[in-house]
């Protein structure tokens, strides 16, 4: 794949309470190893690690020191990217199929910006204090995943704009959208869930036993 894969993996995993997620073991492999396996066909893979972390050897990636936030880490990776198309992926989403990568890549090549999404399966409710509040139509919402694909020049412009305006976002699509550039949606996958809480590890361990991308 003629694409630069950017993996911000410099987070400290505070919510999970197990140290940096990149080195968390699931099914006998680290999340970083699972993630890199999903992008083994990419021409370039760049990973941002926590400051002071020892870069793993033999994984076929270039390792850089990450920033204080996810956004800062992606910005550093972007500076090092050498190809005209990038995929940005969270290391906490280790189970990424080749089909999902292909869909995002194809849409990004066509439109310049693309993200995978899933419909919301549960009822969405805005609570009123501690009481049941207004139900929000779930059909109007989507869960946003990674990998997210962009023209490299476009994402660099979006990050530069965010720095000028003092914008901070939880993903890169928000920064591109802030430029007024449309972001295409493609079908996501439930297996590409984000490991955030301890209960997510139970699902991840079960999936690791049967996973084949």
Swiss-Prot record:
Domain of life: Bacteria
Site feature: Positions MEP for the nucleophilic attack: 138, 194
Matches recorded under InterPro entries: IspD, IspD/TarI, IspD/TarI_cytidylyltransf_bact, ISPD_synthase_CS, Nucleotide-diphossugar_trans
UniProt-listed Enzyme Commission number(s): 2.7.7.60
Site (Transition state stabilizer): 15, 21
Function: Catalyzes the formation of 4-diphosphocytidyl-2-C-methyl-D-erythritol from CTP and 2-C-methyl-D-erythritol 4-phosphate (MEP).
Protein name as annotated: 2-C-methyl-D-erythritol 4-phosphate cytidylyltransferase
Species annotation: Thermus thermophilus (strain ATCC 27634 / DSM 579 / HB8)
């Amino acid at each position: 794949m003629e694409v630069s894969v950017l993996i911000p993996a410099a987070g400290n995993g505070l919510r999970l309470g197990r140290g940096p997620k990149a080195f968390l073991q699931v099914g006998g492999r680290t999340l970083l190893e699972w993630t890199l396996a999903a992008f083994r066909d990419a021409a370039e893979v760049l990973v941002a690690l926590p400051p002071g972390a020892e870069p793993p050897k033999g994984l076929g990636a270039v390792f850089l020191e990450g920033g204080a936030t996810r956004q800062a880490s992606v910005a550093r990776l972007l500076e090092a990217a050498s190809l005209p198309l990038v995929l940005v992926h969270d290391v906490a989403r280790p189970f990424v199929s080749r089909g999902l990568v292909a869909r995002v890549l194809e849409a990004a090549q066509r439109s310049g910006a693309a993200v995978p999404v899933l419909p919301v399966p549960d009822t969405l409710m805005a609570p009123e204090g501690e009481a049941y509040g207004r139900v929000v139509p779930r059909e109007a919402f989507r869960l946003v995943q990674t990998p997210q694909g962009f023209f490299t020049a476009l994402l660099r412009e979006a990050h530069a704009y965010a720095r000028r305006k003092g914008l901070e976002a939880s993903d890169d699509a928000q920064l591109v959208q802030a430029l007024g550039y449309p972001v295409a949606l493609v079908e996501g996958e439930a297996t590409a869930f984000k490991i955030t809480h301890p209960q997510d590890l139970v699902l991840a361990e079960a999936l690791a036993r049967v996973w084949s991308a």
